[in-house]
Structure formats: C-alpha cells, structure tokens
Amino acid sequence: MSSDRPVALVTGANKGIGFAIVRDLCRKFLGDVVLTARDESRGHEAVKQLQTEGLSPRFHQLDIDNPQSIRALRDFLLQEYGGLNVLVNNAGIAFKVVDPTPFHIQAEVTMKTNFFGTQDVCKELLPIIKPQGRVVNVSSSVSLRALKSCSPELQQKFRSETITEEELVGLMNKFIEDAKKGVHAKEGWPNSAYGVTKIGVTVLSRIYARKLNEERREDKILLNACCPGWVRTDMAGPKATKSPEEGAETPVYLALLPPGAEGPHGQFVQDKKVEPW
C-alpha cells in the first residue's frame, strides 16, 4: 500500500557530496529521504551516522551500473510511495590524475557509470516522478572546460537545441571507440575522460528537460544539471576549496525549488546561478 508521503532520493550517497545532500534534505525536505549506495554495509553505516545527528533517512541499495538494481529501486518507490518527488543523481566515479590505468580503459569505465548509469536511472525513474517533481543531475564545471576543449564541430553538436538522446549516446560511444584506437585527440576530443562523461550528463539533462516540456509540461517538473564546485572528497582530494556541505548547497537548492517555480529548467547551474552552456 503506497503512502502519499513525499519522498526524495539521492544516489551515491554513503559519503562525500551525496552524503551531505542527504543530510541537508533530511533537515529541509518535508517527507522521507532515501539514501542509496552500491555497498549495503556502507549505506547502513551512513544512515547510522545520520541517526546519531537526530536525522532519519531510509536506505535502499542501488548500483547504477546494474539495471536489475535500478528496477528493484523503482519497484520499491512505486510500492511504498506511488512514485518519486525528488531525484538527485549524484553517483559517479573518476580516476586519479596519477592513475596508471590506460586512457581507453578509463574512458570506458568512467562512461559506463557516469553517463550510461545515470541515463539508466533516468529511464526507470523519470516516468515515476510526480507532478511538481525536481530532478538534479550532478555534473561538473569540468564538463564546461572539456566542452571548450572539443573541436568546433563537437561543440556545435553538444550545444545543439535539437540533439537527440540517440545522437548523444552515439557520440559517447564514439569517444570510447576513438580512445581505444588512440585517435581521440585527432577526432577533436579533450584529454579528460571524466570531462567527456560529464558533458554527456549535462547534455542529457538538456534533452530530458526538453522531453518533459513536450510530454508533461502541465506537471511543472524541473530538471537541471549542476556543478557542486571543487569539493574535498575522496574523488577530488584534500586540497579542494569547498567542504561537502558547501558542495551540497546548489544540488539541494535545485532539489527544493518551490512549487510553482518556472525555472531554472534544462540549465547548467553553479553556485545557484545559471551558467551559459
């Protein structure tokens, strides 16, 4: 029996920015907050830690690389809540700069999670987002830098207002293939696998926002990509300038855009401001 209680869900939330987003939503969101993580024991540990702070998130396992895991989460949300009000796609990976793993493997592995995993979550969960829902895809300003390092031809494609999801998938796969052949630079790609995957996330967000306008305009769902900033996490390291709490500010702002807000929608947002793409 599903309840009418609102529910927010954050992926990749057992540590870092995701964990800080859950903490902030527990304090500000009027409803249940579901913390998800790939590793059950780490997820439960994270929930316990928040419980010691007097907060009460729920936990559900989610590996965004595993379609079965995504579907199990969707079924849980439908059964318990009849859908989803707020989705924050935060799960992602990056190789360290000094990592010796060959570039083409880094490209494939990073793309699998950051782009295709996020796309798979959206495919399953966007259809169950309730009216006035909010969707936040955590991207990165690295995507803007990577975009500016692309060939003019690629930049034009990624900035297009009419690019389709299929065309974007084709480009992401081409990057992996070009990296395997060692011709990615010659083909106009930047030298950052992480950056290209986050171009994918930002452009995917623009495509999905457009689709929502076409198919569900009256539902007033707002979907955006954002950059949390350079945040001290396992991923970015200790020299980064922002705390995870500061990194959570923009994603939480977008997750809690008030009912009736007209925007932002389909934008790339940094420090609560829309950045030109």
From Swiss-Prot:
Region (Disordered): 258-277
Modified sites of kind N-acetylserine: S2
Modified residues annotated as N6-1-carboxyethyl lysine in this record: K239
Enzyme Commission number(s): 1.1.1.184, 1.1.1.196, 1.1.1.197, 1.1.1.71
The keyword NADP appears for this protein: yes
Catalytic activity: a secondary alcohol + NADP(+) = a ketone + NADPH + H(+); prostaglandin F2alpha + NADP(+) = prostaglandin E2 + NADPH + H(+); prostaglandin E1 + NADP(+) = 15-oxoprostaglandin E1 + NADPH + H(+); menadione + NADPH + H(+) = menadiol + NADP(+)
Binding site for substrate: S140
SUPFAM superfamilies per record: NAD(P)-binding Rossmann-fold domains
Active site: Y194
Compartments, as annotated in UniProt: Cytoplasm
Keywords: Acetylation, Cytoplasm, Lipid metabolism, NADP, Oxidoreductase, Phosphoprotein
PROSITE patterns: ADH_SHORT
Residues involved in glutathione binding: F95, K96, V97, Q106, A193, Y194
Pfam families with a match to the protein in the record: adh_short
Major location (coarse): cytoplasm
GO-annotated molecular function: 15-hydroxyprostaglandin dehydrogenase (NADP+) activity; 15-hydroxyprostaglandin-D dehydrogenase (NADP+) activity; carbonyl reductase (NADPH) activity; oxidoreductase activity, acting on NAD(P)H, quinone or similar compound as acceptor; oxidoreductase activity, acting on the CH-OH group of donors, NAD or NADP as acceptor; prostaglandin E2 9-reductase activity; S-nitrosoglutathione reductase (NADPH) activity
InterPro entries for the chain: CBR1-like (IPR045313), NAD(P)-bd_dom_sf (IPR036291), Sc_DH/Rdtase_CS (IPR020904), SDR_fam (IPR002347)
GO cellular component, one term: cytoplasm
Residues bearing PTM Phosphoserine: S2
Binding residue positions for NADP(+): 10-34, 63-64, 90, 194-198, 231-233
General function of this protein: NADPH-dependent reductase with broad substrate specificity. Catalyzes the reduction of a wide variety of carbonyl compounds including quinones, prostaglandins, menadione, plus various xenobiotics. Catalyzes the reduction of the antitumor anthracyclines doxorubicin and daunorubicin to the cardiotoxic compounds doxorubicinol and daunorubicinol. Can convert prostaglandin E to prostaglandin F2-alpha. Can bind glutathione, which explains its higher affinity for glutathione-conjugated substrates. Catalyzes the reduction of S-nitrosoglutathione.
Subunit and interaction comment: Monomer.
The protein's name in its UniProt record: Carbonyl reductase [NADPH] 1
Organism, scientific name: Rattus norvegicus (Rat)
Classification of source organism: Eukaryota, Metazoa, Chordata, Craniata, Vertebrata
